[in-house]
Amino acid sequence: MITVSDLEIQFGKRTLFRDVNLKFTPGNCYGVIGANGAGKSTFLRILSGDLEPTRGTVMFGPGERLSVLKQDHFAYDECTVLDTVLQGHSSLWKVMQEKNAIYMKEDFSDEDGIRAAELEEQFAGMDGWNAESDAANLLSGLGIKEDLHYSLMKDISGKQKVRVLLAQALFGKPDNLLLDEPTNDLDLETVMWLENYLANYENTVLVVSHDRHFLDSVCTHSVDIDFGKIQLFAGNYSFWYESSQLALRQAQAKNKKAEEKKKELQEFISRFSANVAKSKQTTSRKKMLEKLNVEEILPSTRKYPGIIFTPEREVGDRILDVRNLSKSIEGQTLFRDVEFTVEKGDKIAFLSRDPRAMTALLEILAGNEKPDTGSFTWGVTITNAYLPLDNSAYFQTDMTLVEWLGQYSADTSETFLRGFLGKMLFSGEDIYKRVKVLSGGEKMRCMIAKMMLTNANVLLLDS
């Protein structure tokens, strides 16, 4: 259980949230939601103890264990995969290390024997005999094959490290579990495994995710960070969204009614204030006006980009023909003899246990890679726009944002580009930022803006 009391966090003059009083209880999964920059990750860092709040306290149940999904992918480079997972239960890991060190001694003393017996008791009490098999099961569930369990972390891929660190967070079924974007770099099958695992989790979970389908699957409650405060709602993301939109509409309708009444009273008072015969009615309406409240509806931190794809040309009936496509990387076959046809109006999702296969196929269709065998033909009416998985190559430049977008626009005037960037939530001096310093989310908005400017009639989207 986690109890938050009178919590407030400020950065300079900016207050992210204040007066936060919440309780998170076992058996529930809480989805932490809010706009980029609202303070979702900051809130989790405060709960984990990595960041001191400006004011307030965070308390855990007596003797409860907290586990956090680590974000540093290089912290365990010299550890094996299995040992990295075991370190998720720090108390157990310390017992294991001390116990092993004692047994390695050549001059084993009586004191060592007494201490070893104490450690063995602690080890058994923490279910240490099943620790390695439990860790191995988590790794297998998250798609890390058994032959990698004794590899060093520095020798596995970045995407595999993400899964190992997730297994580390889950290991030992901690009383309180904090997960920041746990589905990043996971394939569909692994996401489904994680959904099932968390849906049956008996302890307290808080999760930050931009994946609303994942939040709908696992969350019993929603924790909304907006308007400078944090509110708790029963229900998953979809239930929160419907409830919050209804509450906003009701508040707006109430204010509209109050404004209309206010205007009516003011008009009566102005019209009859000098009329002695109407003095009682005028006084009565003045009192009514004083009591009339129009509640302030604070501006939301949520802002939505204007993403509109306007094709320059309508597509024909035949969009794409793919015949016998095959592709291998370093001797490993990603796909073989792929055939399909895309027709007008189709929306197709590619699924694979190996994300490299999907990326390779889209790279081929976008014209960036060549297949080993086979061919594909786009329809004569088709112009495609491609959103790659890795966009880093597009931003290795000293260009400003407005200069960068100008490369892809027929209209290169700053007025047009500024307006277009404004639709994608870049305003004021933001347009003069160097693109190489943009955040991942900002770069993604730039890539979508680039796609919009192509006026394409077919979209290729990689994750």
Predicted regions and their residues:
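Short low-complexity stretches enriched in small and charged residues
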Residues: 25-26, 277-280, 301-302
